[in-house]
Design a protein with these regions (language model features):
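Interhelical loop and helix-boundary elements at the membrane-water interface
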Residues: 2-3, 15-40, 75-95, 134-155
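Hydrophobic alpha-helical transmembrane segments of polytopic
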Residues: 35-38, 58-62, 121-124, 128, ...
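Helix-coil boundary and interhelical linker segments in multi-pass alpha-helical membrane proteins
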Residues: 45-60, 96, 100-120, 163-181
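Membrane-embedded alpha-helical transmembrane segments of multi-pass integral membrane proteins
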Residues: 42-45, 72, 100, 128-131, ...
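C-terminal membrane-associated helical module and adjoining short loops/tails
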Residues: 1-21, 145-183
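Topogenic membrane-insertion module of multi-pass membrane proteins
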Residues: 1-70
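Membrane-water interface of alpha-helical transmembrane segments
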Residues: 19-22, 26-36, 56, 112-122, ...
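Multi-pass membrane catalytic core of lipid/isoprenoid biosynthesis enzymes
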Residues: 29-36, 78-133, 163
């Protein structure tokens, strides 16, 4: 009976069985999480720039966050450092970069003068991004990964950022064509 205890290995949460050696602890891996942190910073930077009226820089920061978001998962897969922590951290960073940042950039740029309707519209975008990310997290193991269901939050953020960037850089006034209502 003592021999059975010695040969039996228990797998605890966060432990990964290797291909023939002892268990190794799967923890927080640095490299992919550095990309995620950089993406989170880009989203935060976009919010700060929007609050300072620098909408072109804010839009570029959202695009940079999208680029970094595409790299963090690939780096984790290439280095075989995927973890549940990394997936959750990525999702939280996505909420800032592709949920809160585009909503606040759009609000500061075009919706602020609409009073209550402006912040409600910005909040609806932010809540939609949160719901999309939560649904993605719950369905992660169920859905065919070759296809997207719905519009991914980085793509929605890119549409908003691209719209703001083009209109701001081309100095299109907000009162032309009812641009506030389009935003």
């Amino acid at each position: 009976m003592a021999d059975q205890r010695e040969t039996k290995q228990e797998y605890l949460p966060g432990m990964v069985p290797p291909r023939g050696g002892a268990l190794r602890r799967r923890g927080i891996y640095l490299l992919p999480n550095l990309f995620t942190t950089a993406g989170l910073f880009a989203g935060f930077y976009a919010i700060v720039q929007a609050m300072n009226g620098r909408f072109g820089e804010a839009a570029v920061a959202i695009f940079v966050a999208g680029l970094l978001d595409g790299l963090d998962g690939r780096v984790a897969r290439m280095t075989r450092t995927q973890s549940e922590f990394g997936a959750e951290y990525d999702s939280l960073a996505d909420m800032v970069s592709f949920g809160a940042a585009p909503a606040l950039v759009l609000y500061e740029w075009a919706l602020k003068d609409l009073d209550r309707f402006g912040w409600i519209a910005a909040f609806v975008y932010c809540a939609g991004a949160a719901l999309r990310l939560a649904r993605f997290n719950v369905m992660m193991d169920v859905v065919d990964k070759r296809y997207f269901q719905g519009l991914p939050s980085p793509a929605a953020a890119a549409l908003v950022a691209g719209f703001v960037w083009l209109a701001h850089d081309n100095k299109i006034p907000l009162d032309d064509w009812g641009l506030q209502w389009v935003a």
